[in-house]
From Swiss-Prot:
The gene is htpX. It comes from the Bacteria. Its main location: membrane. It is a multi-pass membrane protein. This is Protease HtpX homolog. GO terms for cellular component: plasma membrane. InterPro entries: HtpX_protease, Pept_M48_protease_HtpX, Peptidase_M48. It is an enzyme of class 3 (hydrolase). Belongs to the peptidase M48B family. It comes from Rhizobium meliloti (strain 1021) (Ensifer meliloti).
């Protein structure tokens, strides 16, 4: 099903890309846009994960440079029956995280330094379990390809303003068509992102809670991340808004309501769903992830440890 959705998504984005090309240069522009879109789809399939990681200047870590963080991901991947993904750290004060990769065998997870500094061990486990759920459901391919193509469509819409405003460029619609392309193309790309992101967050929350073994760990983390995202800006995300739907919580400023134009479901709705899940099941479907006590002698992020940052999270078996 996810493969079919991905194919339909790519087809829609390609048609949208061609439509903007038609506005810029008529039939010739449309054909050029088709060739470019086909090349981008092929390139994005193989390279979009590296492109997104590069956008955020993510640094890969291992069991030596970030033993606690790496150990959490390793244990959760084992719980989920997934191959070990590559593990990255993003230097950003805003607590957040995302997953990327075309399949579970070529996946990566990334957490910000702000997340590792401000969340407890249990909360980080809940967050990373959510990201592994996206990998298990193969959401990461669709999310990453969408981010790449949506960004390209937005740029092409802006490009139309400078080069498509007259009929001498084979533009059959003139300046009015350019204005439509500038407004409609980025908006349509954004709506596609919202459609694929909002429904998948709930399913990833539920599966993530099963992977880590306690829905309340994730619900506590979501509250903290959402609160911090309102006051701590993510400058890289603001420069690359097409990637916003990839994060566990919308990293952009100005997102408050669960409405048509939100890339994520309302946080309180997600928390309520997780709390219902916790009440329905006294124990998770898998054993709670437990820390590697030897690894906990070292810091997960250089010169930092696990901060409690406000209200205490639900206690884990090691607390």
């Amino acid at each position: 099903m996810n493969l079919m959705r991905t194919a339909m998504l790519l087809a829609f984005m390609t048609v949208l890309f061609m439509a903007v090309g038609y506005v810029i240069g008529g039939r010739g522009g449309m054909m050029i846009a088709l060739v470019i879109a086909a090349g981008m789809n092929f390139f994005s399939y193989w390279n979009s994960d590296r492109m997104v990681l590069r956008m955020y200047r993510a640094q890969e870590v291992d069991e030596h440079s970030a033993p606690e963080y790496y150990g959490i991901v390793r244990d959760l991947a084992k719980n989920a029956g997934l191959p070990m993904p590559r593990v990255y750290v993003i230097d950003s004060p805003q607590p957040n995280a995302f997953a990327t990769g075309r399949n579970p065998e070529n996946a990566a997870v990334a957490a910000s330094t702000g997340l590792l500094h401000s969340l407890s061990y249990e909360e980080v486990a809940g967050v990373m379990a959510h990201e592994l759920a996206h990998i298990q459901y193969r959401d990461t391919l669709t999310m990453t390809l969408t981010a790449t193509l949506a960004g390209a469509i937005s740029m092409l819409g802006n490009f139309a303003f400078f080069f498509g405003g007259n009929r001498e460029n084979n533009n059959p619609l003139g300046f009015i068509g350019v204005l439509i392309a500038m407004i409609v193309a980025p908006l349509a790309a954004m709506l596609v992102q919202m459609a694929i992101s909002r429904t998948r967050e709930y399913s990833a929350d539920r599966r993530g809670a099963e992977i880590c073994g306690n829905p309340l760990w994730l619900s506590s983390a979501l509250r903290k991340i959402a609160g911090a995202a309102q006051v701590i800006h993510n400058n890289d995300a603001e420069r690359n808004p097409a990637t916003a739907h990839m994060f566990i919580i919308n990293p952009l400023s100005g997102e408050r309501m669960d409405n048509l134009f939100s890339t994520h479901p309302n946080t309180e709705n997600r928390v309520a769903a997780l709390e219902r899940m916790a009440r329905e099941t006294s124990t998770g479907s898998t054993a709670p992830v437990r820390p590697d006590n030897a690894g906990r002698k070292s810091r997960s992020v250089p010169r930092t440890g696990w901060g409690r940052g406000g209200s205490e999270p639900p206690k884990g078996p090691w607390s």
